[in-house]
Amino acid sequence: MSEKTFLVEIGTEELPPKALRSLAESFAANFTAELDNAGLAHGTVQWFAAPRRLALKVANLAEAQPDREIEKRGPAIAQAFDAEGKPSKAAEGWARGCGITVDQAERLTTDKGEWLLYRAHVKGESTEALLPNMVATSLAKLPIPKLMRWGASDVHFVRPVHTVTLLLGDKVIPATILGIQSDRVIRGHRFMGEPEFAIDNADQYPEILRERGKVIADYEERKAKIKADAEEAARKIGGNADLSESLLEEVASLVEWPVVLTAKFEEKFLAVPSEALVYTMKGDQKYFPVYANDGKLLPNFIFVANIESKDQQQIISGNEKVVRPRLADAEFFFNTDRKKRLEDNLPRLQTVLFQLQLGTLRDKTDRIQALAGWIAEQIGADVNHATRAGLLSKCDLMTNMVFEFTDTQGVMGMHYARHDGEAEDVAVALNEQYQPRFAGDDLPSNPVACALAIADKMDTLAGIFGIGQHPKGDKDPFALRRAALGVLRIIVEKNLNLDLQTLTEEAVRLYGDKLTNANVVDDVIDFMLGRFRAWYQDEGYTVDTIQAVLARRPTRPADFDARMKAVSHFRTLEAAAALAAANKRVSNILAKSDEVLSDRVNASTLKEPEEIKLAMQVVVLRDKLEPYFAEGRYQDALVELAELREPVDAFFDKVMVMVDDKELRINRLTMLEKLRELFLRVADISLLQ
């Protein structure tokens, strides 16, 4: 069967840059699934994406589905005909479904009986006939949150569509896709190359688009070119470009023919904190800042034009003129804000609502101040500095700089605090209170910052849960999942001696009578333990290991982490599987018994050598392991408990627990309870699979 290259290109108006990659990847995945479901043999499915087009190129696509043999078994002969040999209704219905009469059916004979049989040779449908619907279906399944409608048509897509190219080899596949009749005409760059031209064969794509249309359709190629050219441009001026992955992706999605250029701004603007300058360069203008080798911002930036110009200096000057007013605004705001102390913004916090039922930002500040001081006392941080940081924590939200450049919250608080002469750990805490901002982000660097970061997040968790507005489904408007995980990461990775129980109780207490949820403390703790589950699963821990620890509901995060590591190590021991099974057996035996057990094992009642040996070892280990449990040495404790495998196995092999003698039975049940209690000091080992 012959094979050809297939091309589909959807020419549009400018597509959303942040969604371009996902649209193209989904298009390719959807179309590949359509090909596979149709049984069409094919080679590589390559996707292309540029601001005004989505395209797929399929190598070695079969020209038709393979022919196939089908068999449909009908009713058994005994049910297919009546006593007179006439077809039954069941047989006639089956035959109609197959498109034949009962007389035309074959018969299938096996050792189990005889049935009616329909056998047919089905010729594979041509690829040409299948492609239009496959393309339309693939486009309809794209992850587009908001569709557009244009003109007088009722067609919907992410952006208006102007061209549809469907080529199988050199042949146009006739179709109407998204309201546009397919053709071999594609459009080039808006301002360079040929505005539109015909493509003769699918194999010519994307080279013909580059040569005649001045468009680099390959997304990864454009991105790599921007990265390489920007690095070279930065090197030429003795610096390093800030080529963050997210901005690289966005810029690659904004240009069809990237031309990297270098521009500059006045050095006087470097007196403004670099974070504000970088915010406007990256966030507003999509420029790449340039840093010197010592990490200081240089008065230069790199940008990407979408056109080759005979006068590049004109483009450079134009971009310099665009960014200058934004930098001048930042300079003005910075100088204006410093005319008063950060603390002077406190009264204005009373005018901003945190949440209708929970009060203003000033109310939140008072709670954070108190909670940060309480946390600092628990973890051995400077209480005065922590309460001072709490007092100033939201003051920068009232500054001109943060009002205009919102992403500079925190960092501007740090700069203004330094200007006011605040202690360095207080200033740093104002910036780091929002850390970690995302997965993998840095944690607060000093104890005061840790106290403030935990206080801010716990106040939000307690408040929102306290009024019954916990996250539901994918909706989490107050970012409570991120807040909970942030608190856990700080406590675990900084090994802080904090208990979620007392921490949550203190956060709730500071709200006074504002909260309406009577179960708020338990709800917050359960929610945070649930975040633990997600965290450790991401870290590669098995679900049953997590469940074994969660069963004990340890509320000290650092302690929880130690238990997780201990159980994970225990699983590697040879005795683990047998002891997990034994714990499960003990758990079941104890669950079925409703008898009141003794406080201790009565050694004089024990009879069998196996139970005597096990009872002695349980007593010895109980005394030996008490310091281990007190010090959180759970891994060492489980290693010691692993030595119980042989006596436990011997006990269950030789000793009957549920004997008629009540005193003996209760004694044996008590011993098993004491055995299980030792393991439960770490985790519920019976849950391990």
UniProtKB/Swiss-Prot annotation:
Q: Identify the keywords attached in UniProt to this record, alphabetized.
A: Aminoacyl-tRNA synthetase, ATP-binding, Cytoplasm, Ligase, Nucleotide-binding, Protein biosynthesis
Pfam families named in the record: DALR_1, tRNA_synt_2f
Q: What class of enzyme is it?
A: ligase
Instruction: Give the GO cellular component terms, alphabetically.
Output: cytosol
* Subunit and interaction comment: Tetramer of two alpha and two beta subunits.
Q: What family is reported?
A: Belongs to the class-II aminoacyl-tRNA synthetase family.
Matching entries from NCBIfam families are given as: glyS (TIGR00211)
Q: EC number(s) of the enzyme? A: 6.1.1.14
The record's annotation in SUPFAM superfamilies points to: HD-domain/PDEase-like
Could you tell me what this protein is called? Glycine--tRNA ligase beta subunit
Lineage here is:
Bacteria, Pseudomonadati, Pseudomonadota, Gammaproteobacteria, Enterobacterales
InterPro entries named in the record:
DALR_anticod-bd, Gly-tRNA-synth_bsu, Gly-tRNA-synth_heterodimer
Q: What is its main location?
A: cytoplasm
Any single biological process term in GO:
arginyl-tRNA aminoacylation
Record carries keyword Aminoacyl-tRNA synthetase? yes
List where in the cell it is found: Cytoplasm
Q: Name one GO molecular function term.
A: arginine-tRNA ligase activity
What is this enzyme's catalytic activity, as reactions? Answer: tRNA(Gly) + glycine + ATP = glycyl-tRNA(Gly) + AMP + diphosphate
